Structure formats: structure tokens, C-alpha cells
Amino acid sequence: MERTHFWELAAPLREPVPVLVAYDAGVAAICQLAARFDEASWGAQTPLPEWRAFELAGHLRCVADDLHEYLDEAPVSRYARLMATGAHPDTLGRKIARQNAAELAALADAPPAAHIAVFEVSARRYAARLGAVWDLPHHQYRDTVVTVGGMAGAACAEWHLHAWDLARTLGVEYRPADPGAVLAGWRAGMPHLPLPDGSPGAKAVRHLDAWHAVLAASGRIPRSAQDSSAVPAWLLRALQPARLRLRRKEKQRQ
């Protein structure tokens, strides 16, 4: 169908309750899994080859803080300005990865459990801010406007994905209680990273499990039998400098 306007909403989350419940469950899952780590397991490698668990704890703290900044400055935040370029997803991924790496390297030295505690407070405070501004624009990617609610959906998906990362690091399985809400959050908040063909909500035949679709869209499992690379090479390169600095800090603490 031909569009008669220059923008559209990204699969809007018209009802806040399901995604906010799933968001809260994602925060809780991260905290519960983090409580199972000890000094040795915090040093274990996560499914993202260039991040160990203690680095992921710091990243979570940074992301929660960034969400507040983006909301404060929406729709002209630095994240909104980046998305407004309409750049290819790979280009956006490289820029976001460099930002993540720089923030992680600059993070104050603290035990991983302390980072998780700050993350929990910040993430829950963010959710409490959303009700009154749910339908307002947060940013735009190409011709798609993402609302504040859509960005909350993206955050919801990120929390569950990182819970999966922590669980796999511990050698246990993880699956959200409401994968459909997580999938809806991804669709609403991540138009620059579309779902794999054949996943629920994609245009092709619907056959993939909702949670597997999110894992595939995020690069954690292959999108297809032909795609065996779970982590893009550009992400590994972007994270390398911060990884080295963080590991020097870790050695200094020992």
C-alpha cells in the first residue's frame, strides 16, 4: 500500500500495562540472576565473547542512566539525533557500540553487585516516569516514529536479553514469562533492527517462537541455518579497547 504521509508509528504499544509488567520482570530477573554470581563467576565470559559478566553489570548501569538522559531530552537527545540520520543498522550498531564501550571504560570502579544495585534503582525509577508521556515521540528512524512507550519496549527487551546473557554465563536456561510482550517491545522500539523473516509479527509466514525471534533479531542466535555468526565482527572490534581497560582495572583490584 502506498503511504500518503512521511512517517508512521512503530508498531505502537497502545496499552502500557503488558510491557511495563514485562519490563519489571526483566529488571527482577537480572537482579535475581546477579545474586547467584560470586567473585569467580563475575569474571566468566558471557555469550557476547568480548564481555565478561562484571563488564555486563557495568553496562546495565550505564544503559539505565542513558535512558533517563534520552527521556529528559526527547525528541532531540543524542540518541534521537543518531537515529535521525537514518543510517544503515550496521553503521548505527558501530556507533552505539563505541558509545557503550566508552561509557563502560569511564565508569567508576565498583564491585559488579554495586553496579547491579544502582541499575535496579535507576531502571525502576525510569519506569515510574513513563505513564504521563507514554504516547509522546521519543525519536524517529527514517519514516518511523518511536514513542516513549516504544522506547520502554526496547528497554524491556534489552533487560530480558541481558538476563539471558547472565543465565547462560551461569549455565542455566532463561525465558521470559511473557515472550509476546517482549517481542512487542522489540517491534515498537527497534525499527532499525527488524525481526527475522518468519518470526511472529514479521511479514513472512509466522513460524518462529516469539522469544527465539528476539534472540535472533539481537544477534544472540542465528537468524537462519546460513547465519552462524552470533556476534558481528564490528561489535567485537568496537568493544576491544574498553575491554582491555576494564580488565586492567580488574587486575589492579586483585
Task: Write out the residue ranges for each language-model feature.
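Primarily hydrophobic membrane-targeting regions of prokaryotic envelope proteins
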Residues: V27-I30, W51-L67, Y126, W159-L166
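Flexible "arm" and connector segments at domain edges
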Residues: A97-L104, A127, A163, L170
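Structured surface interface patches that mediate subunit assembly and partner/cofactor docking
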Residues: E2-V21, G26, A40-A44, E69-T85, ...
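Helical hydrophobic small-molecule/effector-binding pocket
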Residues: R94-R98, R125-W134
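A short, structured beta-strand-centered segment in the mid-to-C-terminal lobe
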Residues: G93-V121
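HAMP-domain connector/hinge
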Residues: Q45-P49
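Conserved alpha-helical segments that form or flank metal/cofactor-binding pockets of metalloenzymes
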Residues: F54-R98
